[in-house]
Amino acid sequence: GLAEVHTPTLGIEEAAAIVKYYAQKSNQDIALHYDHGFTIDLVKKAIDAGFTSVMIDGSSLPFEENVAKTKEIVAYAHERNVTVEAEIGHVGEGDSYHVEGNTMLTTPEEAKKFVELTDVDSLAVSIGTAHGEYKGTPHLNFERLQEIAAEVSVPLVLHGGSGSGDENLSKAVELGIC
């Protein structure tokens, strides 16, 4: 996969060409994912370059703007048989998951509404993880995860899982993370 923040170093077309080259030499099905796409034009460029799935990340936007941005990408991607992941709530950075507490966690109500409004294929949710290195032990809100899983029918995705521990990851999978 390729995240938008890495595109200045490795361009979208170049990443797609490399993966296509090795995919042709392989007898395996290969997926190519564009992660944390913030810019609509770059996400569309990844789709056009042959990425098989994309993530549109409007999680820092107000809910309505995130919905609108996601709907635009879902319509574009689905016409081209590409799956779309989106994110609501906010996955912190480093130790910010301690500071933000429950205020940035995904709620079951917004998860349900978001999925219904956008027709997204999978949903990244915030349950207490953070990108980067943890300062201390992360405290995942498994009760919130169960509540979200009960409300939505799409696969749930966990970002910031690295460093959260095998036990936390296993429990998250048991409760609905794919």
Regions found by a protein language model. Name each.
Residues 162-163:
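Short acidic/histidine-rich active-site segments
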Residues 156-158:
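Active-site neighborhood of phospho(di)ester-bond hydrolases with catalytic His/Asp-centered motifs
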Residues 1-5, 12-32, 36-154, 166-177:
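Alpha/beta enzyme core
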